[in-house]
């Protein structure tokens, strides 16, 4: 079973956010052909907390919109254990998501979905450190969002 564990450090999250992200990432999981027995976490934080995480773990002392930590990187495979595949953690700054939705002229729901999917693709190994990787990741991101029906309109 695909499991997403949600945590809210802001006190502002509602169940609709959880459901939207759960539906989108379940759709993306199928699009990416990820096995059903997988899990990840999504945590909502404020600007101060995401800046601290960004500083402490990425050496970037600034606010950002989403950070993901893939738990599979450099992990040895353990054979014979019937355990779910743990993909990692996605951390979303709800305040920045609201600001970016307004700045880009689309709904908060679309921005939230975009950030959750962006973090999810990072957990699967996609990146945008060079032009070719960026083209692949952003193309995949757009295709999944379009197929799901979460457009910029």
Swiss-Prot record:
Binds 1 zinc ion. It comes from the Bacteria. One of its GO terms (biological process) is rRNA processing. Its EC number is 3.1.-.-. GO terms for molecular function: metalloendopeptidase activity; RNA endonuclease activity; zinc ion binding. GO terms for cellular component: cytoplasm. Keywords: Cytoplasm, Endonuclease, Hydrolase, Metal-binding, Nuclease, Ribosome biogenesis, rRNA processing, Zinc. It is found in: Cytoplasm. Its cofactor is Zn(2+). InterPro entries: MetalPrtase_cat_dom_sf_prd, YbeY, YbeY_CS. Pfam families: YbeY. Zn(2+) binds at residues 118, 122, 128. NCBIfam families: rRNA maturation RNase YbeY (TIGR00043). Single strand-specific metallo-endoribonuclease involved in late-stage 70S ribosome quality control and in maturation of the 3' terminus of the 16S rRNA. Belongs to the endoribonuclease YbeY family. This is Endoribonuclease YbeY. It comes from Staphylococcus carnosus (strain TM300). The lineage of its organism: Bacteria, Bacillati, Bacillota, Bacilli, Bacillales.
């Amino acid at each position: 079973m695909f499991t997403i564990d949600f945590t809210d450090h802001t006190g502002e999250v509602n169940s609709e956010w959880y459901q939207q992200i759960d539906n989108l990432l379940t759709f993306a999981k199928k699009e990416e052909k990820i096995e059903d027995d997988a899990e990840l976490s999504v945590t909502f934080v404020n600007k101060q907390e995401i800046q601290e995480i960004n500083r402490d773990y990425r050496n970037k002392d600034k606010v950002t919109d989403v950070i993901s930590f893939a738990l599979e990187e450099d992990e040895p495979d353990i054979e014979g254990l019937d355990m779910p595949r743990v993909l990692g953690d996605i951390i979303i700054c709800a305040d920045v998501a609201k600001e970016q939705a307004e700045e880009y002229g689309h709904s908060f729901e679309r921005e939230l979905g975009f950030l959750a999917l962006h973090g999810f693709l990072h957990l699967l190994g996609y990146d945008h450190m060079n032009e070719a990787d960026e083209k692949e990741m952003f193309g995949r991101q757009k295709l999944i969002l379009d197929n799901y029906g979460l457009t910029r309109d």
